[in-house]
Amino acid sequence: MAKEKISPGMQQYLDIKKNYPDAFLLFRMGDFYELFYDDAVKAAQILEISLTSRNKNADNPIPMAGVPYHSAQAYIDVLVEMGYKVAIAEQMEDPKQAVGVVKREVVQVITPGTVVDSSKPDSANNFLVAIDKVGSRFGLSYMDVSTGEFFATELDDFSSVCSEIQNLKAREVVVGYDLLETDEQVLVNQLNLLLSKETEGYDDVHLIGNSLTDLESSVASKLLQYVHRTQMRELSHLQKAQHYEIKDYLQMSYATKSSLDLLENARTGKKHGSLFWLLDKTKTAMGMRLLRTWIDRPLVNQASIIERQNIIQVFLDNFFERSDLTESLKGVYDIERLASRVSFGKANPKDLIQLGHTLAQVPVIKAILESFNDDALSGLLQELDALPELESLIRSAIDPDAPATITEGGIIRDGFDETLDKYRKVMSEGTSWIADIEAKEREASGITTLKIDYNRKDGYYFHVTNSNLSLVPDHFFRKATLKNSERFGTAELAKIEGEMLEAREKSSTLEYDIFMRVREQVERYIDRLQSLAKAIATVDVLQSLAVTAETNHYVRPVFNDEHRIAIDRGRHAVVEKVMGVQEYIPNTITFDSQTNIQLITGPNMSGKSTYMRQLALSVVMAQMGAYVPADSVDLPVFDAIYTRIGAADDLISGQSTFMVEMMEANQAIKRATPNSLIIFDELGRGTATYDGMALAQSIIEFIHDKVGAKTMFATHYHELTALSNSLTHLVNVHVATLEKDGEVTFLHKIVDGPADKSYGIHVAKIAGLPTDLLNRADTILTQLEGETVVIQPQEKVLSQEKPAIETHVNEQISLFDDFTENPVLQELRDLDIYNMTPMQVMMAVADLKQKL
């Protein structure tokens, strides 16, 4: 059989597709974007669109699917959201004037990390990350193409690279070196990233500058090269790459931020129930993004923190002026994203109108800030550049009722361009002339129903019904015949129509040209617009923090150099908001300069984790410049927070709960300094009791003797409380309980000293276990308490070379004397409650109750 001939159009498609094998190719054909071959089959499944075929009668028809060009953005969004790349091939000439195949070229490749336009605009940043490596050092650069933000840094190891990528919530990583297979698996399988290779750099002195290290410059230039290769245009909104160092901010791993619910609730993945949700009273998209950044990266420079506090205090002291400021901020649009649309050549009249409205608000915002008459605001006032000449240009040029498209006309204001006004006058007067002609001919002909209509095919015409055809004047000429009427024209009507159509065509072309010139003028202001955006975002975040401080009765923290923590009647900000102020029980947290470790004991469900998170959250809030929920707060400035809170297997990498515990503990004790905060919750519970206890004791001693970090260590190993006798910088605290008439009430109050009971049986009672089972458990507990566990201090261990924990058991007891074991007991033993959600525990207990 002869080989089927490929049409010139399909050959063009194949030639283009060859250059973009890893992307869906949307091939513009008239009013549709078409996909072919495997792209069509896969896209039809993902997008739920019809799969047809080209050359249906051929032996091997070509699979084909398409989407309308005017609604393509929604389909592109779906593909990109699922982690795919999309290459857009446009027609580069008018098909009516083309000789042969219409010229087509890819004009943009849209990837998860380079989204600019979207049918679902999101205020959050969308960071594209690049990584490079020289020797043992890693370079990392990231950019938000939609806002122009651009940063670069160096990192020590691959785990730090992964943590930073997670913190940035990146979805795509550009790799500038040969990845190890294991590292690639981590990025793809564990972090669910799209990887793109880029070995060439883009040399741009303006954007790279000389403030970066050689490695930072290398990775930043590769990121730039990838962006230019996918976006295929000059991007004037990209900002100069800024050097940053991780140590310039409060260091927290992604796991730590997740366990503290900083930006989203770890259980739901949603904003609600997070610190971000609580603090977000911003009124602008730019402010919202900046607030996320402040929460994600609290400061370690005390002077910078105090600068923020001072402005918040000014806002708190001036309620009415702050209220006016909040109202003005509501009229501010997303300057950064508008500037990027201008840079991409995609800004439409509505975008410029929004920019003009925003610029009109700047003098109002500036006047309000000046009315505070406070030096704390002087820096912000200098940065609030109102750009009056740009606001005047937009206001005078763009009609406030202009359409969103740039081809419909009606964009430019009357009076802005003399020639355009003349064309509009012709069109306006032409309409009046047509009305006069209609009235004149109606009277002259005696056709009372005579009227002039218009359509694109026949232009302007007189509409005459069949019953009036005998009255048609001789100077009328026939244009069209219909079933019940005919259409006529006259020389006079044709002349006016010609003048009007010429004016309309010239007006449309001129209006488009004027708009493009105005947009080009706006582009010259992009740098100043971005500086203005940062200033407004800062004002917005600070007013937001003032509002939350006032609404929730937060206090201004103070900082000390004595390594002292003193939080009087502190609260967990998010838990308090969810529960309500009346229900929440505050707790005082005290570490004097000689106390480094609090060993926290108490029942499960009593509030130990909330107490520890309360401190960590208070530190984050204080160092981002916010006020803190307490009666008073006195803190050192911490350099890092390390946590191990909660227990869950890392199923993707095959690591058990205990392995994850040990890895996170290792990160803490290796990296923490005396200026760090460590939060360990039930460390060691992922292994056998004595293994866990031995490791817990060793870790406590290591932190005490070698690290010196402020540490909260919650444990169910009550035997460890004896360490306070040998470790001078450790104190015991516990969650208070109230026992009365056999009933136990958890008071959620932290008090000095160790807990004397764990009340595990009481928790089981709350869960609804059978009474006879609970009674038997109580008997067994009494027998087990006859055993003794002696905690050896570290000095004794080292000198006698004995294990840290010695266990003396009087004799082996029979746990089930006079007791026939119910099979339910074994199922109960097998429950891994530390790796189950509360709902799963409740369902399991309910199932066990059914079997009793």
UniProtKB/Swiss-Prot annotation:
GO terms for cellular component: cytosol. One of its GO terms (biological process) is mismatch repair. ATP binds at G602, P603, N604, M605, S606, G607, K608, S609. InterPro entries: DNA_mismatch_repair_MutS, DNA_mismatch_repair_MutS-lik_N, DNA_mismatch_repair_MutS/MSH, DNA_mismatch_repair_MutS_C, DNA_mismatch_repair_MutS_clamp, DNA_mismatch_repair_MutS_core, DNA_mismatch_repair_MutS_N, DNA_mismatch_repair_MutS_sf. The lineage of its organism: Bacteria, Bacillati, Bacillota, Bacilli, Lactobacillales. Gene3D superfamilies: 1.10.1420.10, DNA repair protein MutS, domain I, MutS, connector domain, P-loop containing nucleotide triphosphate hydrolases. This protein is involved in the repair of mismatches in DNA. It is possible that it carries out the mismatch recognition step. This protein has a weak ATPase activity. It holds the Pfam family MutS_II. Coiled coil: none annotated. GO terms for molecular function: ATP binding; ATP-dependent DNA damage sensor activity; damaged DNA binding; mismatched DNA binding. This is DNA mismatch repair protein MutS. The gene is mutS. SUPFAM superfamilies: DNA repair protein MutS, domain I (SSF55271), DNA repair protein MutS, domain II (SSF53150), DNA repair protein MutS, domain III (SSF48334), P-loop containing nucleoside triphosphate hydrolases (SSF52540). Belongs to the DNA mismatch repair MutS family. Disulfide bonds: none annotated.
